[in-house]
Structure formats: C-alpha cells, structure tokens
Amino acid sequence: MFGKAGLGGLMKQAQQMQENMKKAQAKLAETEIEGEAGNGLVKITMTCAHEVRKIDISPDLIQEAADDKEMLEDLILAALKSARGKAEETANKTMGAFTQDLPPGVGDFFR
C-alpha cells in the first residue's frame, strides 16, 4: 500500500502534526476567556484548559445579595458555565484546524 518512502513521509507528517497540536494546547492553556452573568455583575476568567484565574463580583451585587445567597450562587454558576462554554468553543476551533482534513476519529490519536 505504502512504499518505505511513502510510509516514512506519512509518519513524519503525523509527528509534525502532533508537535503542532502540543504547541497549540500549550497556548490554549494560557489563553484566558471571560464568562459573565447578570449583565456583568459576576465575571469569571478562566483558561481554555478550564483553570479559573479570577472571579469578579460587583460590589453592588454583594450589597444586593446580602440576603439572597442563592441568587449570588446562581450568578456565579451561570458565569462559570458561560466561561467554560467559550473556552471549549475556542479550544475546539483551534484544535479542529489540525484534524479537519482527517477521516472521522483519526484526529483523536493526536490528542
């Protein structure tokens, strides 16, 4: 099916793709995404590797939520979900560029 030269070239391409994907994953691990809830009253900054780096709660919300712990918890959770969704979307776009021309399932071998 493949000659020695063809198989060697294919392996070299696969190794190069794997190296490029590792570099992209390292960059994503440092790329910060912000999610928010309550029209910006709660903001969460996380990396595309899902490491939460910052939680910002508006002082106005803290005063308003003094008697409504559940509302504050809901807003924090919503901001976290927003950030996570954006992080996953960014990661999928970045990593998808490497595997878009491969047959289905083959790209999983490079992760």
UniProtKB/Swiss-Prot annotation:
Predominant cellular place of this UniProt entry's protein: cytoplasm
Family annotation (SUPFAM superfamilies): YbaB-like
GO cellular component: bacterial nucleoid; cytosol
InterPro entries for the chain: YbaB-like_sf, YbaB/EbfC
Keywords, comma-separated and alphabetical: Cytoplasm, DNA-binding
Subcellular location: Cytoplasm, Nucleoid
A single GO molecular function term of this UniProt record: DNA binding
HAMAP family linked: DNA_YbaB_EbfC
Record's subunit section: Homodimer.
Its biological purpose: Binds to DNA and alters its conformation. May be involved in regulation of gene expression, nucleoid organization and DNA protection.
Family, as annotated: Belongs to the YbaB/EbfC family.
Protein name as it appears in the record: Nucleoid-associated protein NGO_0742
